[in-house]
Regions:
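A charged N-terminal "starter" segment
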Residues: 1-102, 116, 164, 371, ...
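Active-site loop/helix belt of alpha/beta enzymes
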Residues: 5-6, 40-57, 111-126, 133-257, ...
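C-terminal helical cap(s) of enzyme catalytic domains, especially alpha/beta-barrels
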Residues: 14, 71-77, 242-251, 359
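Conserved, mostly hydrophobic/aromatic
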Residues: 17, 39, 73, 107, ...
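Flexible, glycine/charged-enriched surface loops at secondary-structure junctions
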Residues: 31, 206-210, 214, 349-356
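Short hydrophobic/aromatic-enriched beta-strand-loop microsegments
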Residues: 79-88, 102-106, 124-130, 230-231
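A structural signal for short, hydrophobic beta-strand segments that form beta-sheets
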Residues: 84, 258, 314-315
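C-terminal accessory subdomain/extension
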Residues: 263-388
């Protein structure tokens, strides 16, 4: 691993994860379950290691986006309940039961097929009913035009013998935005959510064990809507405006090292396409990180990185495996020096804004060839979170 670290790596600070978890817990209260969203390999941080730490510190649930992600967690020994947020084909019912996965259901037809298959297999599937309150995606539609039909279908779902109906949830689309229009729409979504729950529970006499609607934006701005559980996604990883406002700490730091330094006269081109020419006699350092590692090519000639002696501008097009930085004003920089691409000092969200995207995308883009190095209680740990 040491030889690999001399190239490019991602440091995952599990102490920062713990800090962020506790900030959320204090914000929503001790009685609310915290669900850790670990889909997309834990937003690029490593789903297994993140899930194991969340299990240690008191998370009540996890969430994934597909059945393979759930299987990876179960194979690693994770025992927490796991909610599959999206679509799973009904022909995967046997795997769902085997993995003890909680499945979201978004229509009567899919719910009935799950129920029928579960009964045939001699089992019962735990499910959460998904409500579409304005996202325009999966879920029973709760707008005025479809409300009554969705209510009837949900009441029918409650009667399916092969399902154990545990929860109900929805997803906010603009809860992270504070414009008047966005605030009003988020309030409308919550009103629709609460109204459907009230109608279902009143007419059926059934009570969902878990009600959840708050994502990162909901947690930060509407903690009074925490219900029984909140879903901690990007905010848990300490990235974005909301995380910064709440005092979260970045969990991932993407780092590399200076491979070599070359001297150039003024007017010399750097990298593909000759998009950058040196403006003066310059010292240009080569970093062994490129877009195949997850450093977006769209960030070429835009970002700064942090050396041990200060910030340096990235220059020229980012290549597949390398990029260049201008260290003319940092004469102390030398080959082997550690460089932060983003992390505690260079915020991922700031880089994301430069290429018109969100920090989720940049973190998820950090590729498999970049080793993740985990730290807990200030020391490096292995995949079982034991000190190395």
């Amino acid at each position: 691993m040491e030889s690999t670290l001399k190239r490019t790596w991602a440091e995952i600070d599990l102490d920062h994860l713990t800090h962020n978890f506790e900030v959320i817990r204090r914000h929503v209260g001790d009685k609310v379950k915290l669900l850790g969203v670990v889909k997309a390999d834990g937003y690029g941080h490593g789903a297994v290691e993140i899930a194991k730490r969340l299990e240690q510190i008191g998370a009540g649930y996890l969430a994934v986006s597909n059945i393979d992600e759930c299987e990876e967690l179960r194979d690693s020994g994770v025992t927490l309940p796991i909610l599959m947020l999206g679509f799973t084909p009904a022909d995967q019912t046997a795997r769902i039961l085997q993995l003890h996965m909680t499945q979201a259901v978004q229509s009567y037809d899919i719910a009935k097929e799950f129920s029928d298959r579960a009964i045939a297999l001699g089992g019962k599937m735990t499910v959460h009913v998904k409500l579409d309150t304005g996202m325009g995606r999966l879920g029973f539609s709760c707008d005025e035009a479809h409300f009554d039909a969705s209510l009837r279908d949900i009441l029918r779902v409650l009667e399916l013998p092969g399902l154990d109906i545990e929860g109900v949830f929805t997803h906010f689309s603009v809860s992270d935005e504070d414009t008047a229009e966005s605030v009003e729409f988020t309030k409308l979504q919550h009103e629709r959510f609460a109204r459907m729950i009230e109608k279902v529970e009143t007419q059926s006499g059934f009570r969902f064990q878990l009600h959840h609607c708050c994502n990162a934006g909901g947690i930060a701005s509407y903690p009074e809507w925490a219900w029984d559980m909140v879903r901690c996604g990007i905010i848990l990883y300490g990235s974005g405006d909301l995380a910064e406002k709440m005092g979260m700490q970045p969990v991932m730091s993407l780092k590399t090292r200076v491979a070599t330094i070359k001297d150039f006269a003024a007017g010399e081109p750097i990298s593909y396409g000759r998009t950058y020419f040196t403006q003066r006699p310059s010292r240009i350092a080569v970093l062994p990180i490129g877009y195949a590692d997850g450093l977006h090519r769209a960030l070429s000639n835009q970002i700064e990185v942090l050396t041990p002696y200060g910030r340096a501008k990235q220059v020229g097009r980012i290549c597949m495996d390398m990029c260049m930085i201008d260290v003319t004003d940092l004469p102390q920089v030398k080959s082997g020096d550690e460089v932060e691409i983003f992390g505690e000092h260079i915020l991922c969200a700031d880089d994301a804004a430069l290429c018109d995207t969100i920090p989720y995308e940049l973190m998820c883009a950090v590729s498999k060839r970049v080793p993740r190095v985990y730290r807990l209680n200030g020391v490096s740990v292995d995949k079982n979170l034991q000190p190395l």
